Amino acid sequence: MATTQQSGFAPAASPLASTIVQTPDDAIVAGFTSIPSQGDNMPAYHARPKQSDGPLPVVIVVQEIFGVHEHIRDICRRLALEGYLAIAPELYFREGDPNDFADIPTLLSGLVAKVPDSQVLADLDHVASWASRNGGDVHRLMITGFCWGGRITWLYAAHNPQLKAAVAWYGKLTGDKSLNSPKQPVDIATDLNAPVLGLYGGLDNSIPQESVETMRQALRAANAKAEIIVYPDAGHAFNADYRPSYHAASAEDGWQRMLEWFKQYGGKKSL
């Protein structure tokens, strides 16, 4: 049996489930690149369809706590098959490597907590800029993120006025603040620049339903263009097909809702 690292997954993500989805890459072009950002060269994975007519709509894919491992790369490939230029930047690259951590608690304390939100949001701006120079249509800029990246997706929707649509998968909505994380999504409900779809699990112990309802109330009070869907039979990381938390019916429904959200709000093709 392959280990998580041999399989391309972060060690802290173990044990691996037997439900891993592997997207064929015959019709896409995918690989690694380096994106100039804030004086550094940020590693990133990108995927796009082989055949395209003009600049492509862009989806930035924001990693889980595990970094840009095989699941996130496969998300990019799935989006490429739908006609998008999908880019997943390594947002922890300055602070460390998720593969150096054997379990989730040490990964959270030893790496994730050290990454400032402000740095991440600026890095994502540079990803959008890179996309505009590499076959992407910046007028059709979207973002999606999972777990840690779901929270970042909410924050980025309040950060970048060029963003057209966002889909946040089970990202934290409320919680403690720190120097690196001065705001939570509930604090920026009044500042959203783009419509946001939130996809959450009703059985998620790490994101209580009370916090989901608090966010809904904040969005309603702000008259924000946003929607939160809760899947009653799903827990946290229900789209993570490589983990025991995977809930296929909820994941498949969420994926279709994401694609519809992008089509509805993602902007018009540039002439």
From Swiss-Prot:
It catalyses: 2-(5-oxo-2,5-dihydrofuran-2-ylidene)acetate + H2O = 4-oxohex-2-enedioate + H(+). Its EC number is 3.1.1.45. The keyword Hydrolase applies. InterPro entries: AB_hydrolase_fold (IPR029058), Dienelactn_hydro (IPR002925), Dienelactone_hydrolase-like (IPR051049). GO terms for molecular function: carboxymethylenebutenolidase activity. Disulfide bonds: none annotated. The keyword Hydrolase applies. Keywords: Hydrolase. Pfam families: DLH. The active site is at C147, D204, H236. It comes from the Bacteria. Belongs to the dienelactone hydrolase family. This is Putative carboxymethylenebutenolidase. It comes from Escherichia coli O157:H7. The lineage of its organism: Bacteria, Pseudomonadati, Pseudomonadota, Gammaproteobacteria, Enterobacterales. The gene is ysgA.
